[in-house]
UniProtKB/Swiss-Prot annotation:
A GO biological-process term: proteolysis
Activity regulation (UniProt): SNAP25 proteolysis is inhibited by 1,10-phenanthroline and 2,2'-dipyridyl but not EDTA. Inhibited by hydroxamate compounds with halogenated benzene-containing arms which directly bind the zinc ion.
Cellular component aspect of the GO annotation: extracellular region; host cell cytoplasmic vesicle; host cell cytosol; host cell plasma membrane; host cell presynaptic membrane; membrane
Name of the molecule in the record: Botulinum neurotoxin type A
Disulfide bonds: C430-C454, C1235-C1280
Name of the gene: botA
InterPro entries assigned to the protein according to its UniProt record, in alphabetical order: Bot/tetX_LC, Clostridium_toxin_transloc, ConA-like_dom_sf, Kunitz_inhibitor_STI-like_sf, Toxin_rcpt-bd_C, Toxin_rcpt-bd_N, Toxin_trans
Catalytic activity: Limited hydrolysis of proteins of the neuroexocytosis apparatus, synaptobrevins, SNAP25 or syntaxin. No detected action on small molecule substrates
Length: 1296
């Protein structure tokens, strides 16, 4: 069903219903205007806006243009009936295009439902419409009636391309910011759109970016509609809350204050400029405003000015604000419902998300100040359709967004030139002491007698330099921790899957009816919306500099197109002082070839060679082994843009290696992270439960602190670093285009020197030449983008994250001392729990929380670069064993030869997991290239691998050290060996002096993190310092090795159990790496986190969790209990039973019994999963095995209370009961593989995570939404954390 009620024509006769003359608030003496009601609560006025604000009624250009990138004035636009008809049809077409998407249908329904709150009465027990939320509709008989509305679309005011969303009045009440909301009008035109450079954004397809692209006007309208949604629901951010920029330096953009409201509406990583502390402030503020509205509704006893009933209007606002209502009719704000509504309005509804649904190309940042404007006509279907926009299917415009390409689809786009009232806001950059005569640097109209070389630089081409005032920093504030301290749920990244979940649960019914409003005054008057005061900056400010800047280098590459000959030069100075010279950063050979005059007979060969050389020059890349996370360098970026502090040596690569990515930054960001605020722990005398809960809350709040600091750093990185990188990206595109233009001009000049007869013999096409040069530029931009992205991520990971981690580690150390003292002080209350809690505190606070960029941004370009950054660490390895293409191979650049014995076993599910037995034929031999055989007393090296060591079952294993990885020759080298409860690293020099570093673990423990479980081992060796062993990213032991002399290792690495007395012994190993450097702690943690494969769920041992495989269950809150079934059927239940009991052998092991209780089997929900592996967010069924028969885990969601008791039902009997489970991974440093199971109803609504609840001292399994609210509590404090335990030979227990 379409959104627009019917097809309207401007000349259709008025009927007083959906076509009428209307008067809007604050219109004064205006004549009524013809308007069209395209949908309930939404009108369109195809007129220029000369009446909403008396001060904006003049359509002529103002005497002083606005401080914006571009303005456009044309007083004749939208003055004829044909233009108005086209406007009306264009607007309605865009509404249909928006409504055709799931996201657009949700947004428009929210707008229609967003009736401004009736807070117009001075009596607090009375509801009354606010008059400025109404219009007066002229009836055919000349009378009028008043009608409430939500939105008006109206033509632009004087500046045709200033699209904006505003309120009609009563802004003195702050309606758009107090939860009430107010009627909105949007100044908009479907007849104009803006350009942007695309190839700056796409990294993989050189066919894209052949020129400038045009924004789909549906995206522009959607952006303004999102503003309208914010303002209708009263959650718009105060316009005075802005993102400020510095303005003092020559390179800094002036006069720009981007409102937080605009950043939030755009979404994407721009929204991350608003740091989490400020965002939390906004969320809490509006939560309280919604509570005020609920309170007002509860007080209301009457309604005036309408025939609608009080109860009807209360229901309208209940639907709008998603209020809860109890049996007495009292309204309240449910925090979960509020969070969902607020998230939808502010994070789901964004321009960035609409781009994904429209499947169009778009600017990647709100800070896109492109000055290109195009006239368009979207009404004809041959130009633009509801489903495709400009990129018409079944035409050449469908591929590569060609429909938006203003050069390919040039019939649809008329670029506006010679703007009336175009205002150029600029800075004047002057270099002292250069005497100028006739130079290109002095723009027309400037004094030619200046002794300084000066250039004009448009303000919007300068660096976006954010002020420190933008970043709130409350991280140093202390906090009191109690047993009921609120733990914030983790924010879920916005994905298409999440939006689809919102869509599936969105209520599209109950659209509010038109209600009768008593006639208001014929001229509705309210206070006009106040606009923020924007500080004005002087135009043309002059800066005297001592050296050329990036902008001088770019100006030196420009030239005036004319009939005179130009020539390339490698001298910036010459190019700036001589209008006929153009600076190039290409080689001197290229300069000689392009500047050389050519005879007609040689012309085509000359052109072909120049195109080839141009491609060769732009394709130039360098590589270095000295920077692990930057794999390619574009050496000409330095001389192209004057970047790098070693350029006087023409060595940009050297400068990068010497200084790192910081050389790209014009201003170095400062991140002021203070000493983090401490926790004050509240004591509870003689209350064990509350004391334990306080400790748990402190650990959970510690996790929040890490998250806050990471968010804060990412916000600073995006705003301060990535914006600079993006400007360099843009300027490099301009620089390459300048080179292409100069090359074309020289070739064209040469062609025009020939006689007509000579030209006739030359088959030359300037457009074909342009196409070839553009293709070379676009291919070059792929490498440039890759390099710049790597530099940006490198700066984040090497200069910013470590600084934050150091602050956090100091905080952890302080908290650890406080918690251990708290446990000691309350030891009398914590009887039986002291040791467990101390271990928990020590383990939690000894482990850093790995940084994952995907938690904080959803920009795929940056995320893929971050992933590549992790992989680059592996790429520094000189041996990297992986199973690929049915072979075990070395993925390092050395490709070592590998010999595999006949008794080596590869796991069928993950063939990287290799099983070695205690057999002569069970071995792997790696033959190293001579270049990487270790033979040194100074060079550092590291190794890493994952290992699973089965339990030691008998005394034969005591005091039996055996080697598993051996690189020794002539009693010199290194090896890895095992002993009962030990992993041992040995280094031995040629004089047989050795050093050992050992990790020890116990087999006398109930539930071990190490017995038969995958462990990540890293050993680093700094020859002038220590050898260190890390387990799961944590430093365990270190010993000095500076006393060792030369170590000459073998050229063979042997993986084999050597010297083991137990003939039944075996091990599992995977992901072996050898590095020719000392890995630092950050690299170890990054490598560990990446190889943990957190997107795949793991079982108790660390293997991949599988479908159709039986598992025993371990609840991490109460690990001494197991799951049992009371009875099958809807009246039966499952529960935790205990204790587990023990399995033991004297002096060898003493452990809890793991194979106890009911077995669970995970079944596929849909057939889309091609393998048998369970992944994060998989939707599954859970079967329960009772007496060798499978039953389905399910619940009746209509049960009273939050906790829904789970039952084991006959599978055919499940019917409409809730049975779908969403699997969630919770990877705790790769040791404990926690899983959470979120039960949903048949509509996809969350019932809650599966845990347990005490009913009459029986711990019954339930699905509870309480867990969903507390999900970020520390791992062992919630009953919804589970581990799946399969039977495994390495554990040695006989299943019951």
């Amino acid at each position: 069903m379409p959104f627009v009620n019917k097809q309207f024509n401007y000349k259709d006769p008025v009927n007083g219903v959906d076509i009428a003359y209307i008067k809007i608030p604050n219109a004064g003496q205006m004549q009524p205007v013809k308007a069209f009601k395209i949908h309930n609560k939404i009108w369109v006025i195809p007129e220029r806006d000369t009446f909403t604000n008396p001060e904006e009624g003049d359509l002529n250009p103002p005497p002083e243009a606005k401080q914006v990138p571009v303005s456009y004035y044309d007083s004749t636009y939208l003055s004829t009936d044909n233009e108005k008809d086209n406007y009306l049809k264009g607007v309605t077409k865009l509404f249909e295009r928006i409504y055709s998407t799931d996201l657009g249908r949700m947004l428009l329904t929210s707008i229609v439902r967003g009736i401004p709150f009736w807070g117009g009465s001075t009596i607090d027990t009375e509801l009354k419409v606010i008059d400025t939320n109404c219009i007066n509709v002229i009836q055919p008989d000349g009378s009028y009636r008043s009608e409430e509305l939500n939105l008006v679309i109206i033509g632009p005011s004087a500046d045709i391309i200033q699209f904006e969303c505003k309120s009609f009045g009563h802004e003195v009440l702050n309606l758009t910011r107090n939860g009430y909301g107010s009627t909105q009008y949007i100044r908009f035109s479907p007849d104009f759109t803006f350009g942007f450079e695309e190839s700056l954004e796409v990294d993989t397809n050189p066919l894209l970016g052949a020129g400038k692209f045009a924004t789909d006007p549906a995206v522009t309208l959607a952006h303004e509609l999102i503003h309208a949604g914010h303002r209708l629901y009263g959650i718009a951010i105060n316009p005075n809350r802005v993102f400020k920029v510095n303005t003092n330096a020559y390179y800094e953009m002036s006069g720009l204050e981007v409102s937080f409201e605009e950043l939030r509406t755009f979404g994407g990583h721009d929204a991350k400029f608003i740091d989490s502390l400020q965002e939390n402030e906004f969320r809490l503020y509006y939560y309280n405003k919604f509570k005020d509205i609920a309170s007002t509704l509860n007080k209301a006893k009457s309604i005036v000015g309408t025939t609608a009933s009080l109860q009807y209007m209360k229901n309208v606002f209940k639907e709008k604000y998603l209020l809860s209502e109890d049996t007495s009719g009292k309204f309240s704000v449910d925090k979960l419902k509020f969070d969902k509504l607020y998230k939808m309005l502010t994070e789901i509804y964004t321009e960035d998300n609409f781009v994904k649904f429209f499947k169009v190309l778009n600017r990647k940042t709100y800070l896109n100040f492109d000055k290109a404007v195009f006239k368009i006509n979207i009404v004809p279907k041959v130009n633009y359709t509801i489903y495709d926009g400009f990129n018409l299917r079944n035409t050449n415009l469908a591929a590569n967004f060609n429909g938006q390409n203003t050069e390919i689809n040039n019939m649809n786009f008329t670029k506006l030139k010679n703007f009336t009232g175009l205002f150029e806001f600029y800075k004047l950059l002057c270099v002292r002491g250069i005497i100028t005569s006739k130079t290109k640097s002095l723009d027309k109209g400037y004094n030619k007698a200046l002794n300084d070389l000066c250039i004009k630089v448009n303000n919007w081409d300068l660096f976006f330099s954010p002020s420190e005032d933008n970043f709130t920093n409350d991280l140093n504030k202390g906090e009191e921790i109690t047993s009921d301290t609120n733990i914030e749920a983790a924010e879920e990244n916005i994905s298409l899957d999440l939006i689809q979940q919102y869509y599936l649960t969105f209520n599209f019914d109950n659209e509010p009816e038109n209600i009768s409003i008593e006639n208001l005054s014929s001229d509705i008057i309210g206070q006009l919306e106040l606009m923020p005061n924007i500080e004005r900056f002087p135009n043309g400010k002059k800066y005297e500099l001592d050296k050329y800047t990036m902008f001088h280098y770019l100006r030196a590459q420009e030239f005036e197109h004319g009939k005179s000959r130009i020539a390339l030069t490698n001298s910036v100075n010459e190019a700036l002082l001589n209008p006929s010279r153009v600076y190039t950063f290409f080689s001197s050979d290229y300069v000689k070839k392009v500047n050389k005059a050519t005879e007609a007979a040689m012309f085509l060969g000359w052109v072909e060679q120049l195109v080839y050389d141009f491609t060769d020059e732009t394709s130039e890349v360098s590589t270095t082994d000295k920077i692990a996370d930057i794999t390619i360098i574009i050496p000409y970026i330095g001389p192209a843009l004057n970047i790098g502090n070693m350029l006087y040596k023409d060595d940009f690569v050297g400068a990068l290696i010497f200084s790192g990515a910081v050389i790209l930054l014009e201003f170095i960001p400062e991140i002021a992270i203070p000493v983090l605020g401490t926790f004050a722990l509240v004591s509870y005398i003689a209350n064990k439960v509350l004391t334990v809960q306080t400790i748990d809350n402190a650990l959970s709040k510690r996790n929040e602190k890490w998250d806050e600091v990471y968010k804060y750093i990412v916000t600073n990185w995006l705003a301060k670093v990535n914006t600079q990188i993006d400007l360099i990206r843009k300027k490099m595109k301009e620089a390459l285009e300048n080179q292409a233009e100069a090359t074309k001009a020289i070739i064209n000049y040469q062609y025009n020197q020939y006689t007509e007869e000579e030209k006739n013999n030359i088959n030359f096409n300037i457009d074909d030449l342009s196409s070839k040069l553009n293709e070379s530029i676009n291919k070059a931009m792929i490498n440039i983008n890759k390099f710049l992205n790597q530099c940006s991520v490198s700066y984040l990971m090497n200069s910013m994250i470590p600084y934050g981690v150091k602050r956090l580690e100091d905080f952890d150390a302080s908290l650890k001392d406080a918690l251990l003292k708290y446990i000691y002080d309350n030891r009398g209350t914590l009887i039986g729990q002291v040791d467990r809690l101390k271990d928990k505190v020590n383990n939690t606070l000894s482990t850093d929380i790995p940084f994952q960029l995907s938690k904080y941004v959803d920009n795929q370009r940056l995320l893929s670069t971050f992933t590549e950054y992790i992989k680059n660490i592996i790429n520094t390895s000189i041996l990297n064993l992986r199973y690929e293409s049915n072979h075990l191979i070395d993925l390092s650049r050395y490709a070592s030869k590998i010999n595999i014995g006949s008794k080596v076993n590869f796991d069928p599910i993950d063939k990287n997991q290799i099983q070695l037995f205690n057999l002569e034929s069970s071995k792997i031999e790696v033959i190293l290239k001579n270049a990487i055989v270790y033979n040194s007393m100074y060079e550092n090296f590291s190794t890493s691998f994952w290992i699973r060591i089965p339990k030691y079952f008998n005394s034969i294993s005591l005091n039996n050290e055996y080697t598993i990885i051996n690189c020794m020759e002539n009693n010199s080298g290194w090896k890895v060996s095992l002993n009962y409860g030990e992993i041992i690293w040995t280094l031995q020099d040629t004089q047989e002096i050795k050093q050992r570093v050992v990790f020890k673990y116990s087999q006398m423990i109930n539930i071990s993190d190490y017995i038969n479980r995958w462990i990540f081992v890293t050993i680093t060796n700094n020859r002038l310092n220590n050898s260190k062993i890390y387990i799961n990213g944590r430093l365990i032991d270190q010993k000095p090795i500076s006393n060792l002399g030369n170590i000459h290792a073998s050229n063979n690495i042997m993986f084999k159990l050597d010297g083991c007395r137990d003939t039944h012994r075996y091990i599992w190993i995977k992901y072996f790496n050898l590095f020719d450097k000392e890995l630092n702690e950050k690299e170890i943690k990054d490598l560990y986190d990446n190889q943990s494969n957190s997107g795949i769920l793991k079982d108790f041992w660390g293997d991949y969790l599988q479908y159709d495989k039986p598992y025993y269950m371990l609840n991490l809150y109460d690990p001494n209990k197991y799951v049992d079934v009371n009875n099958v059927g809807i009246r039966g239940y499952m529960y935790l039973k205990g204790p587990r009991g023990s399995v033991m052998t004297t002096n060898i092991y003493l452990n809890s019994s793991l194979y106890r209780g009911t077995k669970f089997i995970i079944k596929k929900y849909a057939s889309g999963n091609k393998d048998n592996i369970v992944r994060n967010n998989d939707r599954v069924y859970i079967n329960v095995v009772v007496k060798n028969k499978e039953y389905r885990l399910a619940t009746n969601a209509s049960q009273a209370g939050v906790e829904k008791i789970l039952s084991a039902l006959e599978i055919p009997d499940v019917g409409n009961l809730s049975q779908v489970v969403v699997m969630k991974s919770k990877n705790d440093q790769g040791i404990t593989n926690k899983c959470k199971m979120n039960l949903q109803d048949n509509n996809g609504n969350d019932i809650g995570f599966i845990g347990f609840h005490q009913f009459n001292n029986i711990a019954k399994l339930v699905a509870s939404n309480w867990y969903n609210r507390q999900i970020e509590r520390s791992s062992r404090t919630l009953g919804c954390s589970w581990e799946f335990i399969p039977v495994d030979d390495g554990w040695g227990e006989r299943p019951l």
